[in-house]
């Protein structure tokens, strides 16, 4: 097991990877109740840039995953463009990707992934989508 921090838009693994946990950069809207300063630091125009950055990271990391490997996509956001819509676009572009449903009694199942809302009494707003590379 090797844990590292690097620029995920350009980083290249020396060998194909078994698993990638992508805690993607996001608006952090899901942690707003604990970090109210986010209201002052974010603008609505930031979302499109963040979504584009997420796409760039996914585009760089996906080819580095082994066939049969798993990518876990995570954000601390509750916004659909950063979460479910991001995954819809990803699956539309990658026929070699298959969602591995997260069977859990927490959160709300989405068309792709699982959304945890801050109002559910289980902490902050987070989104999770588990993806298997099938070819």
List each model region and its residues.
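A mobile, often basic/glycine-rich helix-loop segment
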Residues: 31-49
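Conserved SAM-binding strand-loop segment of SAM-dependent methyltransferases
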Residues: 1-8
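C-terminal catalytic and target-recognition region of SAM-dependent MTase-like enzymes
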Residues: 9-10, 14-21, 25-27, 48, ...
């Amino acid at each position: 097991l090797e844990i590292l921090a690097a620029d995920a838009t350009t980083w290249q693994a020396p060998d194909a990877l078994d698993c990638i946990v992508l805690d993607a950069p996001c608006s952090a809207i899901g942690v707003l109740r604990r970090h109210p300063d986010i209201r002052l630091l974010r603008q609505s125009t930031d979302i499109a840039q963040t979504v584009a950055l997420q796409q760039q990271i996914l585009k760089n990391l996906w080819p580095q995953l082994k066939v049969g490997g798993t990518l876990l996509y995570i954000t601390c956001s509750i916004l659909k463009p950063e979460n479910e819509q991001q995954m819809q676009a990803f699956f539309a572009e990658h026929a070699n990707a298959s969602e591995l449903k997260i069977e859990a009694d927490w959160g709300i199942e989405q068309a792709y992934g699982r959304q945890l809302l801050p109002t559910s009494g289980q902490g902050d707003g987070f989104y999770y989508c588990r993806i298997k590379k099938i070819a």
